[in-house]
Each structure stands twice: as structure tokens, then as C-alpha cells.
Curated annotation (Swiss-Prot):
NCBIfam families: miaB-methiolase, MiaB/RimO family radical SAM methylthiotransferase. One of its GO terms (molecular function) is N6-isopentenyladenosine methylthiotransferase activity. It holds the Pfam family Radical_SAM. This is tRNA-2-methylthio-N(6)-dimethylallyladenosine synthase. [4Fe-4S] cluster 2 binds at residues 184, 188, 191. Its EC number is 2.8.4.3. Binds 2 [4Fe-4S] clusters. One cluster is coordinated with 3 cysteines and an exchangeable S-adenosyl-L-methionine.
Length: 467
């Protein structure tokens, strides 16, 4: 998952009561797709309380920062933002006005009271498992409390979140995220997720289908199922049998209006036969798979507690491509994990060559407090990490550009997602996730049209519509 920073657009929380004219919220999102989804659900919850969204903190009564804790710089971004908000809050106070500041997400879960110590201007700290309590927490803040809500709730948060209004969902577009699973039980030694998101929890089939049907009714054509370890999802199916993610995908594909399905992020250990069968038989399931491996060295994979070997990963990729030859792969890589030798790194480079990724994310290892990796010895020098990352990214970039170039001349169906920058231009999404720009097009957002790729842009494809 990427670490792009986004914000909730004003359309995502509309006026629902007379109080809406006096209370505005600005939600800023750091981190992964799950955080984007969580921010949308928090916006829905606040809309039910009479808040309207604004695209700037300048006129907001509530600023909510939904944070990421995967890498150190994400925490640094939070405290930098809080420093700027402190000045804004002080200026408001000088004018006799109030600004409520809340911190949500994984940094909130990891640091809790420490956030209030480092940033006393913060009024509210709320974790990813308790944000359904946000309205109550804000009421306590208005009563003069400093609130920290980071316990793991006994109740099911999804049962306590209001469903977004149809008009609100419609304004979010024709592609949507849907969280089906949270948490992780893998305990990779570099990762904070088990400590910030908790143990693996799967939502029920009933909940998932109901939310998917609401999204489809609002015009959503493409669903991306989310989870920290999404292919670990399991639950009792409508036929009384135990279902895995493969069976769930087949069920969602039956919902009228849903034309495309994706899922992220996966673990190689949980790619079972039913999920591979879904890739073989389900045309709505797009031929793009994010399957992180982190390293190509068995020794480093063991130190990371990844629970698989490099050749097992490669054999899995072969199985998937045997049933879906047009499958494109993306992945995650960490360089400079403690003890990584030159040979370990070369093993990673070879695995990348063997797989030939369409896209990948790569990072230098940075120890996260509280993880087993932080206590490992034999740390790799920063200069060595830098050199290895540069080499790896050069190889991955070459593969990405080659993949884009391989699209030239191909014909494909594209889901139109939004107008382009120029008049008559539309931007769509290819089956392989790349944005596609189509000129002189009269079709509407939500239409799926047949195009031919004629050239490439920077991380995009240029297409002509076919009759």
C-alpha cells in the first residue's frame, strides 16, 4: 500500500441538520487505502452529527488527522502538522474562537497519551478500532475533557457506524474501497500493524454484501476489497460453509452493477486454491495483484518472519500466471534489513528479474519501536542502504516503463472515472490499474468503453476509443 497523503473532499460529508451551518470538519489522511476508507467512514459519522466537510483547515471547527505509522517519516509528518495547527489554534483563541484538533489512525493507536504530552494542543486521540465512538468522544471534548480512545473495542465498530447517504456515496465516484478484513497475525519483525491494528478480524458476509449493494446502488462500478492481510479473510457463507476470499469474490460479482473487483494487500501464505480459482474463472476480477515479498533472500525472509521462502513465492506466481496469463504483479521491498549482505541483496535483485513487476514500492529499512526488528543487531550502514535502494529502484522503474510500453497497440476495456484536464478529455482505469487518458470522448463517468492504447505518458496510457 502506498503512503500518499489525501484529504476528504467537501462532498463527502453533507449538511444533515441545522447545526451543520456552524460546524465544519477538515479531515487529512496519511497512508494507505485503508486509512482513506476509514476517513470516509469517519466523515459519514460526523455528517450524521451535523458536520460538513471543508477543503481547508482555515475555516474548520474540527481538524482530524488520520495517521500512518508504517515508517518513521509518517510520524514526523504528524508532529509537523500539529505544530502548524498549534499556531492556528492560538490565533483562534486570541479572537475568542475555538479549534478542536483530533489525531486518529495508527500513530494515535501506537502513541496514545504520548501525543498529548508532545502536542498539548491536541484535544482528541482515537485509534482505528474505536473511531465509531468519535461522536461521543467529541461530546466529551466539548465538555472540557482531553480524550484518548485507543482500547480495542469489544463491540463491532462496523455495526455502530452510520451508513453513508446515497448522495454522498455517489459523489465519491465510480470506484470504491470496501474494508473486509482488519489486523494481522503474521508478526513480521519489521511491521507495526499487529500492534496498531490488532489481530486479524474478518467482517461478516452479511455486512460486506450489504455495503457492496449500497455502493452499487450509488453508481459504484469497481470495488477494491481492503485488509491489512485481505486474503486471510474468512467467514460463514450464505450456504453455511466456511468461505475464503475466493468465495466472497464470486458472491460480490453477482451484485448488479459491480463490473470490476480488486483486492489488496495480500500475503503469499494466504493465496489458497479457491482464490487462485477466482483469478481463473472470474472475469470481473482484474488481472492485477499486489503481492508483497519484501526480499529475495531466504535468510532475510526468515529473519523477517515472513514464513515462506523465495522459491515458494516464485512457484506461487507461476501458478497464478498459469491460470491468468495476463496477470500483472506489484510488490513491496525492503532493503537494508539488519544482517542483509551483498549476496542477500543480489538475491532480491534476481527475484525481481524473475518476476518482472509492473509496479512496486521499495523502501530503506527503518526500525519501528516495539517491533522485534528494532532489537536486531548488525544494522546496515545508511550509505549501503542508499546504494542498494537506488539500484533496486532503477531495476523496478525499468520494468514498470517496459510494462507500460507493452500496452501500446493493445485493445482493452477502460472504466471512465473522471473528466480530464482538457475539454472533451476523460480519464479512466485500465484492468492493470494504470490511468488511461482518452481525448475527444463523449461518454460518461461510469461507462466502460473499448479503446486502443496509442502511447504512454508519465505513469499513464493514452488511448483512442474504438467503435
Amino acid at each position: 500500500m502506498s503512503d500518499d497523503t489525501t484529504q476528504i473532499e467537501p462532498a463527502m460529508a453533507q449538511e444533515t441538520s441545522p447545526r451543520a451551518n456552524t460546524r465544519k470538519v477538515f479531515v487529512k489522511t496519511y497512508g494507505c487505502q485503508m486509512n482513506v476508507y476509514d476517513s470516509q467512514r469517519m466523515a459519514d459519522s460526523l455528517a450524521a452529527e451535523g458536520y460538513v466537510a471543508t477543503d481547508t483547515p482555515d475555516d474548520a471547527d474540527l481538524v482530524l488527522l488520520n495517521t500512518c505509522h508504517i515508517r518513521e517519516k509518517a510520524s514526523e509528518k504528524l508532529y509537523s502538522a500539529l505544530g502548524r495547527l498549534r499556531k492556528m489554534k492560538d490565533a483562534r483563541a486570541a479572537d475568542g474562537k475555538e479549534l478542536t484538533i483530533g489525531v486518529a489512525g495508527c500513530v494515535a493507536q501506537a502513541e496514545g497519551q504520548e501525543i498529548l504530552r508532545r502536542a498539548p494542543n491536541v484535544d482528541l486521540v482515537i485509534g482505528p478500532q474505536t473511531y465509531h465512538r468519535l461522536p461521543n468522544a467529541l461530546a466529551r471534548v466539548r465538555g472540557g475533557e482531553k480524550v484518548v480512545e485507543t482500547d480495542y473495542a469489544i463491540e463491532d465498530k462496523f455495526e455502530h457506524l452510520p451508513a453513508p447517504r446515497r448522495e454522498e456515496t455517489r459523489k465519491r465516484g465510480v470506484s470504491a474501497f470496501l474494508a473486509v478484513q482488519e489486523g494481522c497475525d503474521k508478526f513480521c519483525t519489521f511491521c507495526v500493524v499487529p500492534y496498531t491494528r490488532g489481530s486479524e478480524v474478518s467482517r461478516s458476509v452479511k455486512q460486506i454484501v450489504a455495503e457492496a449493494e449500497r455502493l452499487a446502488d450509488s453508481g459504484v462500478r469497481e470495488l477494491t476489497l481492503l485488509g491489512q492481510n485481505v486474503n486471510a479473510w474468512h467467514g460463514e457463507g450464505e450456504d453455511g460453509r466456511e468461505w475464503g476470499l475466493g468465495e466472497l469474490l464470486f458472491r460480490l460479482a453477482r451484485i448488479p452493477g459491480i463490473a470490476r473487483l480488486r483486492y489488496t494487500t495480500s500475503h503469499p501464505r494466504d493465496m489458497d486454491d479457491s482464490l487462485i480459482a477466482a483469478h481463473r474463472d472470474l472475469r470481473q476480477l482484474m488481472p492485477y495483484l499486489h503481492l508483497p515479498v519484501q526480499s529475495g533472500s531466504d535468510r532475510i525472509l526468515k529473519a523477517m518472519n515472513r514464513r515462506h521462502k523465495a522459491d515458494e513465492y516464485l512457484r506461487l506466481i507461476e501458478r497464478i500466471r498459469n491460470v491468468r496469463p495476463d496477470m500483472a504483479l506489484s510488490g513491496d521491498f525492503i532493503v537494508g534489513f539488519p544482517g542483509e549482505t551483498d549476496q542477500d541483496f543480489e538475491d532480491t535483485m534476481q527475484l525481481v528479474r524473475d518476476v518482472n513487476y509492473a509496479q512496486a514500492y521499495s523502501f530503506k529499512y527503518s526500525p519501528r519501536p516495539g517491533t522485534p526488528g528494532a532489537d536486531l543487531d548488525d544494522h546496515v550502514e545508511e550509505a549501503v542502504k542508499d546504494e542498494r535502494l537506488q539500484r533496486l529502484q532503477a531495476l523496478l522503474s525499468a520494468q514498470q516503463y517496459a510494462f507500460q510500453d507493452s500496452m501500446i497497440g493493445r485493445k482493452m476495456d477502460v472504466l471512465l472515472e473522471k473528466p480530464g484536464r482538457e475539454a472533451g478529455q476523460m480519464v479512466g482505469r485500465s484492468p492493470w490499474l494504470l490511468p488511461v487518458i482518452i481525448d475527444d470522448n463523449k461518454d460518461r463517468v461510469g461507462d466502460i468503453i473499448h479503446v486502443k492504447i496509442v502511447s504512454t505518458g508519465t505513469n499513464s496510457l493514452i488511448a483512442q476509443k474504438l467503435a
